[in-house]
């Protein structure tokens, strides 16, 4: 698509990218033809519509649009119509129907029209042609005394007129014309060669124009008529042609046609003499007449032939209709239908050669045509069909063409011009022929009866062909390239060979070109053509006359002016020169016979001469022609490609300009409309948009909820439930649609009311303005009036004063002057009153006119505004309605598609789940069989061991018996000594093994004592810490006033640090967990104290507490990860069980309670899935915060160590480095940090160290502490979220061990808050032993009680009850183990199986254990070499719930395992 698409709502308005260079394939054309209702096999004549329609561009008012589902449709922005198919398809369907109707009606009445036209045109044509010829050839006066002899010419049989030797008629008739006016055939052939070149250039112009795509604007009536004629005339060309010629020859009346054709006969008196006239030196002016006439014919033909390709030159063509009529009218004479001179032997050969050349040229010409548009292809195909059909029907169509100039313009012009030339030949001869002509024509017209005449015609045809080929090489380069395609129409059909000779037609076609080519060929003809002296003289005269005619003819070559030039002025003098030589009364029968004999002799001589020259140069000319044709074909290809490329560029540029202009206009129009409407309808638009969005969102939500419900219940409901659901959806959609319609109507009503109110306000404001304007005008006029009156009064007073002064000076004249002045004053007052009255009337009239004008303008503005608002309202209503209906339809389609896809997906998933379930069941069965076989093997091995033990006891008893009887049986000592040694070896081996076991036990006991001593040391340290805490509490009480001064913003920034911490809260629980929580709580309170005092003492405590909290948070996250994994496993098992129940519920009878229970189960499962997703995101965030906090702690510690590095080495002796890890979950061991040290020792050592350290930089520590506060706050919120996502009520395991959980004080800091959840979840996770743990245990450590495993089962059963409120039939009813059904094994069953086989440690467990020990050894070495790492291990976890191993390094740096 071109340009950026425009979005209207959720619809995308696209632009069509029209490709001018696209050429559809034939298969695409056939498919499109079938789409618009064309049968390509039965209706090939309508295929041009398919070729045109498949590449037709989209109309301007139509635009392609795309909805949100991706479907493309077409929308008419003019009338609001939309459709799925291309708008041009319907248009071309109607065109197909119209064309089919035209073809059917024209085919039905064509035969009737032919007969009627023949009779009607006999009466119509003579007066028309006489008028036309009289107007164009007025100076020509021909006597009409030869009408009686012409009447006898009609009596000749039709075979003489339509035979292949019918040309002899013209030659024999011409032999006695105009008192022996004869000329050489070579001269006539030269002229024919010239006309051939002229016709070629005409065809070139026509082809080029059709290729440029200008043929799209041709006259449709003419094209339809030519198509009909070509279709109906192509079935039986030979038979129709013979019959039409016979009919024309038998029915024509020469008396009527002679009156109209005699001016044309004088005009073309030399045209037929070119073919068969002997040399007559006494008449040199006839060649000039012939050339001028041929040029006139060419010009007329150019003017008429350019119409199919250039409709814009119709005005030039209309300006000269008389020329066309003059050239067309003589075609009505049927006697000269085919005046070609060739024999039966030579004509087929030349026709084949010309046909080959024409086919090659046609192929070359068709290649670029295929690249043009479909309109150009249709026009070119139509023109080719017209040429062929008219060539077969030229005698038949001559009457209609002569009588109807409009049909003449629509048809091809080359054939009509040739017919006119032949008819003119016979018409010219008709006045000079009598009965002798008739007698001479009858034997010459029948080719089977007169062999001698056929031989003469053969010689004549050879001569004509020889001269043609001799004269064709010097043709101009353009004319040689253009003439073969033009003559192809006559050479293409072999059935016309016997009737019309193609070479003569080529020669006559070539006579229709411009005068420039004619003069050039005349000069070349003088140089190359070997002809008698008379012919040369005539050629020179003809060349001179052609040069005189040159300017007029060159004007005709120009495509813009070729019709406007009249050919009659150069023709008239030549025709006048022939007037006194054609009186038919002076000719006698003897003269005619003498002329015939002379003509026969001259013809024989010329034929022999031409045969010899033809045989010599035929091969050379053919080679030259082939070479030139190839060159011209290449040149034509290049020219046509260039023209096509330039046309494409112009069309593309025009399209782009038009698109840009349309976009600009549309944008201007839209911007104008927006600017006009925005001010008045912004609020309403927002309200409507909000309502629409709300309704659409509500509709979408309802649809989504319905889709989810359908997805959930798709597999458990049958067709009846689906139909019911569809009905409910339709009802809801109808209700929503009604609601939308109501909302839309409401919005429109509001908009209408607002517009009415605005209109009233505008009217009121306009009236107020008008009234104000009137008042202002009145006041201004009154003010002016008052000023005028006051000025007049002042003038009067001044005049009175002057008069009084004069009266005082001149007492004698006072009375007289007073009378005069009083009279003048009265006149002045009267004049002033009249002037004021007129002025007042004018002002009032002007006021009234202005008021009327303003009222009219106001009414116009109101009407215009009312119309604009109404149009805008209608437009918005239509847009909203269309948008809503389109949205509803789109949602319905999307809903149906989504339903179908969901149905298919559910079906596929169900199949996959069933297949997986079958595979899992098969695997579980295999595992059960494997376990059974392993159990059997173990039992067998145990039985074997018992048997071996029994045999060992018996052997020992036997050995004792042998020792008692040693003295008695000394002779057997040697035999039994060996047995005794073997027994002793076995005994020693057993003793050694027992000793090793004792040593291991002693080592474990020693380790236990060490650990107890460490515990005592830790208790002592805890007491010391308690004392230190009391001192710190005293200091905290002293600094209470500082804590009260902390601002509200700091409290909000760190809400989890609260200063009111009491030591009694820390003393409520004992043990290691108590120590952790106390230290962490104290670290939080000490951090608050540090923020005020910034003492290094508090910083070390802050660092210690944060380290403990960090490790606790890590452990909590690890426990949460394990819990989440278990919940995920249980969720997967529950989902599998739910799917199984759903499938069983569908297979069994429908029961709504069961379906409702399954729906509740599904909701619970979805809720659990959401909770797990939230837990994942929260844990991810917690991990990130832990990393940040650890980095900050490391930075703080490194800064502290840098401050203390210059104080000397660390005081105190570190205790032994050790690592303690929990074996309850070996899978997540690698992800945990094994750096756990003893915080009390570390804090005590740091306390001892801190006393001697100087104060730190407050700014750096304050920044790090502030970042730690923020991270701790975020981490607390994340851990609280994780705590809230877990089950609220702890499992029974937590109730059985209350002493081990620290109390949670609501006033304590949030850091211990997640310690409680940590303890709860650590206890929960530690209650689930795995096979790896039992492999480590190997029976030495304390066993977990059965209540622990039972607690895990209870917890999982509680989960199952939450997922399945209706009950768990698998757990309550099925006696099979849980592993076979739910995909996991219960803790009790794991304990039972693992205790049974604890002696056999798997290889994988040992390998994992060895790898872990090796990694821990390397880590211990790294810790030993790093002095900055913490020195003490963390306190052990409660022994009642955890089975712990401790790794340590002995004096040889080897790892030793201590279990406790």
Curated annotation (Swiss-Prot):
SMART domains associated with the record: WW
Subcellular compartments: Cytoplasm, Cytoskeleton, Microtubule organizing center, Centrosome, Centriole; Nucleus
Post-translational modification, as annotated: Phosphorylation at Ser-186 is induced upon DNA-damage caused by treatment with IR irradiation, UV irradiation, hydroxyurea or amphidicolin. Also MDC1-mediated chromatin remodeling is critical for DNA damage-induced phosphorylation.
Segments of skewed composition (Acidic residues): 217-227
Basic residues: compositionally biased ranges: 109-119
Main localization of the protein described in the UniProt heading: cytoplasm
Intrachain S-S bonds: none
Tissues in which the UniProt entry reports expression: Expressed in several cell lines.
Keyword DNA damage: yes
Coiled-coil boundaries: 1154-1206
Region (Interaction with ATRIP), start-end ranges: 1-194
UniProt domain WW: residue ranges: 56-89
PROSITE patterns with a match to the protein in the record: WW_DOMAIN_2
Region ranges (Disordered): 107-135, 213-412, 440-593, 658-719, 1290-1310
Keywords in alphabetical order: Cell cycle, Cell division, Ciliopathy, Cilium biogenesis/degradation, Coiled coil, Cytoplasm, Cytoskeleton, Disease variant, DNA damage, DNA repair, Mitosis, Nephronophthisis, Nucleus, Phosphoprotein
Ranges of Basic and acidic residues composition bias in the record: 256-270, 310-323, 357-367, 465-481, 537-546, 658-668, 686-719
GO cellular component: centriole; centrosome; ciliary transition fiber; cytosol; extracellular space; intracellular membrane-bounded organelle; nucleoplasm
Illness: Nephronophthisis 15: An autosomal recessive disorder characterized by the association of nephronophthisis with Leber congenital amaurosis and retinal degeneration, often resulting in blindness during childhood. Additional features include seizures, cerebellar vermis hypoplasia, facial dysmorphism, bronchiectasis and liver failure. Nephronophthisis is a chronic tubulo-interstitial nephritis that progresses to end-stage renal failure.
PANTHER family (alphabetical): CENTROSOMAL PROTEIN OF 164 KDA (PTHR18902:SF27), NUCLEAR MITOTIC APPARATUS PROTEIN 1-RELATED (PTHR18902)
Identification of the protein by name: Centrosomal protein of 164 kDa
Gene symbol of the encoding locus: CEP164
